[in-house]
Amino acid sequence: MISSNDFRTGTSIELDGSVWRVVEFLHVKPGKGSAFVRTKLKNAQTGSVVEKTFRAGETVPQAILDKRTMQHTYKEGEQFVFMDMETYEEVRLTEAQIGDRVKYLMEEMEVNVLFWNSQVIDVELPNTVVLEVTETDPGVKGDTATGGTKPAIVSTGAQVNVPLFISIGERIKIDTRTDTYLGRE
C-alpha cells in the first residue's frame, strides 16, 4: 500500500484491476476543508489518461512491477524485438506499446522493461542518449540574436532543437525525458 502523499511521477498503483502510472500530481491544501492530491493517471494496458482526486493520506495498493534489463536487438516488420540479458528470452513490442520514446530507440540499446503479471507495462529508456546529427540548417556567423536554436534531425529520425553552431555529422547528447539538447559528445 502507498499513501497518496507519497505519489511521484512514475509511481505505479493498482485501481479497478489495472495498473495505472502517475503522470502528474499536485498536492492541494484549500483554505477550507481537507487537503487532497489531484492526479493524472495513465492506464498501462490501454494508454488512456484520466484525472483522479485522492484524499491526502489515502492509501491505495501499489503495483509490484518486475523490472528487467533488456537489449533492443532488431526491428522485424512493425515489431521491436528485445532480448533479456540474463535468460536470452525475446519479447516483441509494437510501436504503440513503446510510445513516442521509439524515436530514440537504437539497436543494441539497453532498456528497462517493466512487467506486471507477466505482461509488459512500460519501456524505460536511458535518461540520455548520444546521437549523430543527420540534417540541420547551416549556422550563419553572428546569427545568435534570437536565442540561438534551430531544428535538427538525428540518426534515429527524431527532431531536436540545437544551438546554431551544431552542424551535420556532430554527435550530441539528448535528454530522452524532455527531448532537449544537453551538449556535444
UniProtKB/Swiss-Prot annotation:
**Which cysteine residues pair off into disulfide bonds?**
none
Q: Which PROSITE patterns match?
A: EFP
What are the protein's UniProt keywords? Cytoplasm, Elongation factor, Protein biosynthesis
Any one GO cellular component localisation term in the record: cytoplasm
**Molecular function GO terms recorded:** translation elongation factor activity
Quote the Pfam families the UniProt record gives: EFP (PF01132), EFP_N (PF08207), Elong-fact-P_C (PF09285)
An example Gene Ontology biological process: peptide biosynthetic process
The protein's location, in the record's own words, is: Cytoplasm
Pathway terms, separated by semicolons: Protein biosynthesis; polypeptide chain elongation
Which CDD domains does the entry link to? Answer: S1_EF-P_repeat_1 (cd04470), S1_EF-P_repeat_2 (cd05794)
Q: Which domain of life is it from?
A: Bacteria
Instruction: Supply the Gene3D superfamilies for this chain.
Output: 2.30.30.30, Nucleic acid-binding proteins (2.40.50.140)
Q: Which InterPro entries match?
A: Elong-fact-P_C, NA-bd_OB-fold, Rib_uL2_dom2, Transl_elong_fac_P/YeiP, Transl_elong_KOW-like, Transl_elong_P/YeiP_cen, Transl_elong_P/YeiP_CS, Transl_elongation_fac_P
Name the principal localization, coarsely classed. Answer: cytoplasm
Q: What does this protein do?
A: Involved in peptide bond synthesis. Stimulates efficient translation and peptide-bond synthesis on native or reconstituted 70S ribosomes in vitro. Probably functions indirectly by altering the affinity of the ribosome for aminoacyl-tRNA, thus increasing their reactivity as acceptors for peptidyl transferase.
Family note: Belongs to the elongation factor P family.
The identity of this protein, by name, is Elongation factor P
Q: Which organism is it from?
A: Picosynechococcus sp. (strain ATCC 27264 / PCC 7002 / PR-6) (Agmenellum quadruplicatum)
